[in-house]
């Protein structure tokens, strides 16, 4: 992908941001928890979430997609598939399916692309196996392909040492099909799983950082949901509005869950002009986000609620690079094991652009600098590619391996063009 510098300000409303990826994954998976059809509108039709939908179909569900909505009719009982369940590039899909399938009757194999199969899975496999699951794979079940022989667990308690929505969700799904659990975490992680399970009728309660879940005695209620647009995907364009002079963007129908908009709160602390307009609430708070050009962004130190902004960190680094002074992100070691080593890849790419930046073991330091055109390697990481596309609106950018953008945001390049950007996107 080649991006050329913008020659005008951005003044538009964007209503076609990609649907929320986290919610879409869960809509497909959690439809299996009911005995009636779930109806899902605005499902994310991107590589990762379409793979999840395909897996649900292989597990026995009937999928009807009429364009306006997807109707998922669950099987009476999750069936043992006769082929490998391919998760593509999605760690969320693989880790949540590990929990869901660990308590089913049958044999299942989860795999993904070369990037996903190199990512760590022991954080899920180890606690599940300690509770009685039978999960095996390379390097003591740390890498896919993973083999799962379903079994029922006794009731368990688990005190997580990390704030991870994926660890939490996997264990809750396994417990739901077994004998329930108590789960505690050091700080609140993304809570979509708890919200959606409660909305479907599960007996789940939260007391500060502890969750109590009772086993599923009967099927849950089906979903009937309009998936909101993804705040992580919208964040790229929020950063664009902040750094392109005289810009004003309204981002429509965005998920406003507090565990998903922390990166916007960081921008506000840096001096960004951002307004939130809540419009509706069912399973989640939804609304519009209004962002204006903010020429006086100042550096900041960020060390708290990192799990709430982990996906936005590469784009946040672009905002840091365009701010005045030094910014520092710490407690973000999780970035090392995402689709790429996002600390190393982000900092190396910024250096190529002439930005004064350095790695920390658990984050990075960035001094605001004038960026210049560069050819950067995204290392097959969709969020790296999109983040540097946004920087390219200021200084131009050539991005290698940009085809991975399609795993989460198929119409990203089209929105850039609608904004007035000149984009050569043969890879997309």
From Swiss-Prot:
The active site is at residue 311. Phosphoenolpyruvate binds at residues 21, 91, 119, 166, 342, 383. It comes from the Bacteria. Coiled coil: none annotated. GO terms for molecular function: 3-phosphoshikimate 1-carboxyvinyltransferase activity. NCBIfam families: aroA (TIGR01356). Belongs to the EPSP synthase family. This is 3-phosphoshikimate 1-carboxyvinyltransferase. It comes from Campylobacter concisus (strain 13826).
């Amino acid at each position: 992908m080649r991006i050329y510098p913008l020659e005008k300000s951005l003044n538009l409303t964007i209503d076609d941001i990609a649907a929320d990826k986290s919610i879409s994954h869960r809509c497909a998976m959690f439809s299996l928890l009911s005995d009636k059809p779930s109806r899902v509108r605005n499902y994310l039709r991107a590589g990762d979430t379409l793979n999840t939908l395909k897996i649900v179909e292989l597990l026995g569900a009937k999928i009807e997609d009429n364009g306006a909505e997807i109707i998922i009719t669950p099987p009476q009982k999750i069936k043992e598939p006769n082929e490998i369940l391919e998760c593509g590039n999605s760690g969320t899909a693989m880790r949540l399916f590990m929990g869901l399938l660990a308590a089913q009757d049958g044999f299942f194999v989860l795999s993904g692309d070369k990037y996903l199969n190199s990512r760590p899975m022991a954080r899920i496999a180890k606690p599940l196996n300690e509770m009685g699951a039978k999960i095996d794979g390379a390097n003591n079940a740390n890498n896919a392909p993973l083999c799962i022989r379903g079994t029922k667990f006794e009731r368990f308690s688990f005190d997580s040492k990390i704030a991870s929505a994926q660890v939490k969700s996997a264990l809750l799904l396994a417990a739901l099909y077994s004998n329930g659990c108590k789960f505690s975490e050091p700080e609140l992680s993304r809570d979509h799983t708890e919200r959606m399970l409660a909305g479907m009728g599960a007996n789940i309660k939260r007391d500060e950082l502890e969750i109590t879940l009772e086993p599923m005695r009967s099927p849950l209620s089906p979903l009937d949901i309009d998936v909101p647009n993804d705040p992580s995907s919208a964040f790229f364009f929020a950063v664009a509005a902040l750094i392109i002079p005289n810009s004003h963007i309204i981002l429509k129908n965005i998920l406003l869950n507090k565990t998903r908009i922390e990166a916007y709160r960081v921008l506000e602390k840096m001096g960004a002009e951002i307004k939130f307009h809540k419009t509706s609430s069912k399973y989640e708070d939804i609304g519009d986000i209004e962002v204006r050009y903010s020429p006086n962004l100042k550096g900041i130190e960020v060390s708290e609620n990192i799990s709430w902004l982990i996906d936005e960190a590469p784009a946040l680094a672009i905002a840091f690079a365009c701010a005045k002074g030094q910014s520092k992100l710490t407690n973000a070691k999780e970035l090392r094991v995402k689709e790429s080593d996002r600390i190393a890849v982000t900092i190396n790419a910024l250096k190529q652009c002439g930005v004064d930046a350095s790695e920390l073991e658990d984050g990075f330091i960035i001094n605001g600098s004038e960026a210049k055109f560069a050819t950067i390697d995204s290392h097959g990481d969709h969020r790296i590619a999109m983040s540097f596309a946004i920087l390219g609106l200021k200084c131009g950018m050539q991005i290698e391996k940009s085809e991975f953008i399609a795993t989460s945001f198929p119409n990203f390049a089209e929105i850039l063009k609608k904004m007035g950007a000149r984009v050569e996107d043969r890879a997309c």
